[in-house]
Every structure is written in structure tokens, then in C-alpha cells.
Amino acid sequence: MKKFAALLAAVVILAGPLAAASKDEKETDRLENCGLIVKEIMDIPDDIPQDLIDKAECIIVYPSVIKGAFIVGASGGRGAMVCRTGEHFTGPWSAPTMMALEGLSVGFQIGGQATDFVLLVMNPRGARSILNSKVKLGADASAAAGPKGRNAEAATDVTLRAEVLTYSRARGLFAGISLAGSTVRPDNGANEKLYGKKLDAKDIIFKGAVAVPAAAQKLVAYLNQKSPKNLSDPESLK
């Protein structure tokens, strides 16, 4: 009996580090996927215009998991958001806050293929709203399908005034897509798993409460190289 108790204690001791290591595994994998998606998409010259990337305050990436012909639960997915640091979004890119995407239309059929979503948050109001609470696209924040091409000159005024520009990639095809009616929100439960403590999304972005985790270093380094400076009108950042 004593031998069994000793063996059980040893198993518990060994299992502890394994459980801790796997606790944030999903979030770590998600961040690595976000980095791959952003680089693959932004390295293609005729996809997201560089001038829009340079004027974005934040970028949200959702690597989606598909079940059958629909997004799982016909509702949404999980991803991450990075922003330019500082009160006025003028600093280097931040550590990520984990995000949720909810309320996708059940009619969003994609033939069983994985679909990635990339959202550009184009002004401070939109960024602060998303960091504060859940935001319904098209209602709480104006949203539009993002334009493609080397620049955004051909985009409509409605598109250029949107607080959030949305893109999708499925079957290797990349396009602007409307996500109006969907909800984006910080996933604070995932943040706690990733960082090992309770954190508010605003603390991560504005206060630099945590360092960039290893799984997100490629994503953040790539964005700092791709778009090191916010080129928005300084007056719009106040």
C-alpha cells in the first residue's frame, strides 16, 4: 500500500508540469498560426494595401476551424489582436490579447475549407471600443469588406470611413468580405491561460502588462518590420 501511495504521489508530481505546459497549448498554437497567416497574406503584393496596414491601429486574426460545410457551431472562432502601443497607438506593435469572433451567419458556407479572417482596425475609437467590450460589427463599429490591391485609392468613401476592414482567405483565395452582424470581443479566459494570470485586454495593449510571448514573437517582429510607424493623420489619433 505504501509503495502504491508513493507511486501515486510521484505521478501527481510529474503530471503537474505537464498540465501547466499544456494549459496554454491551444493559445500558443493559435498565436503561431496567426503569425503565419499574417505573413503569408501581407507578403502578397496585391492583397491588403500597404497604405491601409500603415494606418491601422490594430490587427485581428482569426484562424478558423471548420466542421463540415460550416464554421464550427455556425457561430465563430478564436484568434488574437495586436495593436500599436501607447495611448495614441503610435508605438511599436504590442503583445497580443486573445479574441473571440461570434455570431457569424449560418449561411456563411465555405465548403468545408478552413477560412482565415483578418480585420484591420482603422481608428482609435474602434480600437478602444473593441478592447473595452464586445463590439457588433456594423452596429457598434462601422465595418466594410476591405479593398485589395497595391493601394486603397480605388476604395469607396464608405470603405475608407469604416472603423474595421475585414478580409477572408479560403481555398487559397483571398478577398474582402463583410462580417456585419458578427461580434468581436476580448477573450479574457484565453488571456489568463496564455499569460498565467488574469489580465484585461486594455492592460496588455495600453500598459504593456506582459512581454510578447514566444509564440507571438514572429508575428510582432514581422509587423514591426512591415509597418514600423503609424501613418494615420496625427489629429485622428488624439
Regions found by a protein language model. Name each.
Residues 7-16:
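Bacterial N-terminal signal peptides
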